[in-house]
């Protein structure tokens, strides 16, 4: 089964008031866990490679081939998007598209809005020629993302409206108080701004840094137009905690399969739980029919 784009996937989710989870891949076994979770839950899924981890994972072509081969070997039948997360430049997005990624995020959020729009339009124009969906970001999601530390800067409503109108993107990540990594204290999303941005742009919104956000805030974000929710930290913590427990119980373990398997199983269970929480479980059949 070929990769699908986010365009119709997220439009359907927004219309039906649920969200599709993006789960970042951190290796082959990690990818298997995400795909297996999606198949068991009959949920569409977005498997993402962060730009900063692409080289670590073997490059764009390796990632595309690995995910595609796993889908075939595992007989995956649910819709799978292969997405570039936080693409750092138009060139990196082009490389991902040429390697077979079905979706890319161009992150120009650290630049002035005019430059952000120009970068995004360049990517969107190239992606449109290849049938690939595009996500952009306005404002700054704080915290740590693969070693990059930044502060929170709320998205401006007018800037969000501009980037959507001028670039023809498929999804918008509007920074509204979420952070990458672990939260210090209670997350506090900007729902007033969220409602205004959703109304003005009328496209699927993306919630970055969703690990650790309380379920009631997640549900409210979905009702206010979020159709894609990104999870990475919770999966990493689940894997690390379980792997650490394995070594605490048996410090003599040395076979990777022996000490990694419980952690991978924890990742799968975390992904399944999030799919149920986001309301995407059981939606694969409708997505395929639609």
UniProtKB/Swiss-Prot annotation:
Keywords: Lyase, Metal-binding, Phosphoprotein, Zinc
Cofactor(s) required for function per UniProt: Zn(2+)
A Pfam cross-reference name: F_bP_aldolase
Residues the record lists as binding dihydroxyacetone phosphate: 181, 209-211, 230-233
Lyase among keywords: yes
GO BP terms: fructose 1,6-bisphosphate metabolic process; glycolytic process
GO molecular function: 5-dehydro-2-deoxyphosphogluconate aldolase activity; fructose-bisphosphate aldolase activity; zinc ion binding
Modification type Phosphothreonine: residues: 233
Family matches, as SUPFAM superfamilies: Aldolase
Catalysed transformations (reactions): 6-phospho-5-dehydro-2-deoxy-D-gluconate = 3-oxopropanoate + dihydroxyacetone phosphate
UniProt enzyme class: lyase
Record: active site: 85
Gene3D superfamilies, sorted: Aldolase class I
EC number(s) given by UniProt: 4.1.2.29
CDD domains (UniProt xref): TBP_aldolase_IIB (cd00947)
Key word Disulfide bond present: no
Family: Belongs to the class II fructose-bisphosphate aldolase family. IolJ subfamily.
PANTHER family: D-TAGATOSE-1,6-BISPHOSPHATE ALDOLASE (PTHR30304), D-TAGATOSE-1,6-BISPHOSPHATE ALDOLASE SUBUNIT GATY-RELATED (PTHR30304:SF0)
Its job: Produces dihydroxyacetone phosphate (DHAP or glycerone phosphate) and malonic semialdehyde (MSA or 3-oxopropanoate) from 6-phospho-5-dehydro-2-deoxy-D-gluconate (DKGP).
Name by which UniProt lists this protein: 6-phospho-5-dehydro-2-deoxy-D-gluconate aldolase
Organism encoding this protein: Bacillus velezensis (strain DSM 23117 / BGSC 10A6 / LMG 26770 / FZB42) (Bacillus amyloliquefaciens subsp. plantarum)
């Amino acid at each position: 089964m070929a990769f699908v784009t986010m365009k119709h996937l997220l439009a359907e989710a927004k219309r039906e008031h649920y969200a599709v989870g993006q789960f970042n891949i951190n290796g082959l076994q990690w990818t298997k866990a995400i795909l297996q979770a999606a198949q068991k839950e009959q949920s569409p899924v977005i498997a993402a490679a962060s730009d900063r981890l692409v080289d670590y994972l073997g490059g764009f072509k390796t990632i595309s081939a690995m995910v595609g081969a796993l889908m075939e070997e595992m007989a995956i039948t649910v819709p799978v998007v292969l997405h570039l997360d936080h693409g750092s430049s138009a060139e990196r997005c082009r490389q991902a598209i040429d390697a077979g990624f079905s979706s890319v995020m161009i992150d120009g959020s650290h630049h002035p809005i005019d430059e952000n729009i120009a970068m995004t339009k360049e990517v969107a124009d190239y992606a449109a020629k290849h049938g690939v969906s595009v996500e952009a970001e306005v404002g700054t999601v704080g915290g740590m993302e693969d070693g990059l530390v930044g502060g929170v800067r709320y998205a401006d409503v007018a800037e969000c409206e501009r980037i959507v109108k001028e670039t023809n993107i498929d999804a918008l990540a509007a920074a509204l108080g979420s952070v990458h990594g672990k939260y210090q204290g209670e997350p506090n999303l900007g729902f007033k701004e969220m409602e205004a941005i959703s109304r003005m742009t009328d496209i699927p919104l993306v919630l970055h840094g969703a690990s650790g956000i309380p379920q009631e805030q997640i549900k409210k974000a979905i009702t206010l137009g979020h159709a894609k929710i990104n999870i990475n930290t919770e999966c990493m913590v689940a894997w690390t905690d379980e792997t650490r427990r394995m070594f605490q119980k048996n410090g003599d373990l040395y076979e990777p399969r022996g000490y990694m398997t419980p952690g991978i199983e924890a990742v799968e269970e975390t992904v399944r739980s999030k799919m149920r929480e986001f309301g995407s479980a059981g939606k694969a059949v409708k997505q395929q029919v639609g």
